[in-house]
UniProtKB/Swiss-Prot annotation:
Gene Ontology cellular component terms for the protein in this record: centriole; cytoplasm; nucleus
The protein's name: Coiled-coil alpha-helical rod protein 1
Function noted in UniProt: May be a regulator of keratinocyte proliferation or differentiation.
Coiled-coil region(s): 82-314, 344-437, 498-691
Amino acid sequence: MFPPSGSTGLIPPSHFQARPLSTLPRMAPTWLSDIPLVQPPGHQDVSERRLDTQRPQVTMWERDVSSDRQEPGRRGRSWGLEGSQALSQQAEVIARQLQELRRLEEEVRLLRETSLQQKMRLEAQAMELEALARAEKAGRAEAEGLRAALAGAEVVRKNLEEGSQRELEEVQRLHQEQLSSLTQAHEEALSSLTSKAEGLEKSLSSLETRRAGEAKELAEAQREAELLRKQLSKTQEDLEAQVTLVENLRKYVGEQVPSEVHSQTWELERQKLLETMQHLQEDRDSLQATVELLQVRVQSLTHILALQEEELTRKVQPSDSLEPEFTRKCQSLLNRWREKVFALMVQLKAQELEHSDSVKQLKGQVASLQEKVTSQSQEQAILQRSLQDKAAEVEVERMGAKGLQLELSRAQEARRRWQQQTASAEEQLRLVVNAVSSSQIWLETTMAKVEEAAAQLPSLNNRLSYAVRKVHTIRGLIARKLALAQLRQESCPLPPPVADVSLELQQLREERNRLDAELQLSARLIQQEVGRAREQGEAERQQLSKVAQQLEQELQQTQESLASLGLQLEVARQGQQESTEEAASLRQELTQQQELYGQALQEKVAEVETRLREQLSDTERRLNEARREHAKAVVSLRQIQRRAAQEKERSQELRRLQEEARKEEGQRLARRLQELERDKNLMLATLQQEGLLSRYKQQRLLTVLPSLLDKKKSVVSSPRPPECSASAPIAAAVPTRESIKGSLSVLLDDLQGLSEAISKEEAVCQGDNLDRCSSSNPQMSS
């Protein structure tokens, strides 16, 4: 705690033994008597360090005393010279000693406190030792009880071992039966596979024989094709002879062609005429439609002129009188509607306030109930914690049983390994069965392919027979043509022209070449198909041989695997026996410990159940009170809901009446708008017509002015009156026209303003309706 004031190094204990503390003189310091005789081991090092620091000071004091005793004369002589130095040194030493004394007193106080603490600790340890002795006695008693329980458990273990041995014997018997059945099934599958392989070999041999026969048939077909080619060369010569006959027939047919050409041209002309008639009819219909439209326009123009004349006859009213009365009515109606809406909003606001007050009251009741529930939940949590503490104690007791459970788990793992080995053996057997089945499927597919190839052979035979029939028919036709040619030659011996004969020869040569190409193609196709069939047969034969080899290898592998599986089964049986013995012993010990723990748990659970029943009775009583309060709150809520429903029905009725009134007013306004639009259209038509009339009047004036000028030249005596008379109507016409235009423009402006005001009012009405719907929706939801 405090750094040493003397030397920095440690002094061995032999130094203190060589210089005991009893040899100190009479004026030794007082701190040596305060050191306790028995010090704690933690503070021995500190005390030794303090003694080491104090040892040099003691030696210095001894030297001073000895020098004072032995040499009094010398000190008296040198007193005058060294008096001042010795006094100063002694004062410094005394000051240092005082500081050391104070420090040592503090350390002594601390050591006393530590000694008291150690005494308290020793007393506590003594108490703990007594408690441990008592616990050992109780543990010995418990051990004796456990030994007795183990003795009973051994009896149970023996019984369990006997039962487990019986079960193992039954399991082994069943396993042997399963193995025998599997081996029999495997042998049967192998026998079936061998029989199938033999059948496939036989089918391959039969296919080879068939292919040899087909090759012979193909050679014969090739020979027949060569013969047919020779016959075709002969038939070409016959066809050249028949060319003359064909030319004669063409000439005969050419004489009758013009009548057909005339009929075709007549039909084309008739179709063209019909198309032109249709186009003309369509044009007529379109012209009729345009005429009708023009007539309608003329009628509308006449009607507009009549209306314009009537309007001109009338006097133009001022613009102030054109304001409609329905705007005032609309404003008054809107004001009344707004007042009603305001009244309804006030009612809704009052209902909302009442509802909010009731909701607040209910929330307060719910909060109080929640507080009660939380208090009950806290009590339940306390009880649960007590239960958890007791459960923890039980778990501490169960920790001893976990060792036994681990041993049981090891035994179970050994048993699982044995089961896994058996499962792996079964899986290997399944794989063998699957391989056999897959080989069977592959053989079936190959057989199907072979059957398909055999099925294609009749089609090839049919094609060959068809070619032979075609050749026979060609022969018959050629013979017929030859006979006809001979007859014609006899009837008309004149030779045909050279050009026709050459053409017929070319055609016959082309037909000959085409027939040769067809025969060559058919022969090539037949050869290709025969080659393909041979290749397929050889490939299938090779594949079947490979499959047979693979099956033999698989059989050998399965036999080896069965032998290894037998060895594994024997090892697994031995391990199973050992594991069953260990499991039986562990089960007995577990049952004993479980019985003991079960009794202790039942006692503790009974105590906890009594406490919980008391607490549950209290909670049930409180819950019944809360349910009563909740029922009261529900009744009040239902009353409030009924009132809200009544208010809602009233508001719906008012809304329906308002909607009906609004619809009627809208219909009336729509009628009024239609009338105004009709008047507006009439006025626009009149304006357009007015423009037309002004143009007509200008043209009329331009036509009339030259005649007036001619009259003015002829009549010189009275030139002014005609001008006045001519200018007067023009001046009269101009102001009237301008006044009419001004009045019409004012009328149009008024109509536009009125339509804008109506549209604005409708928009405002729609917005109010939307606001009212939005305000009513929250009330409905509340």
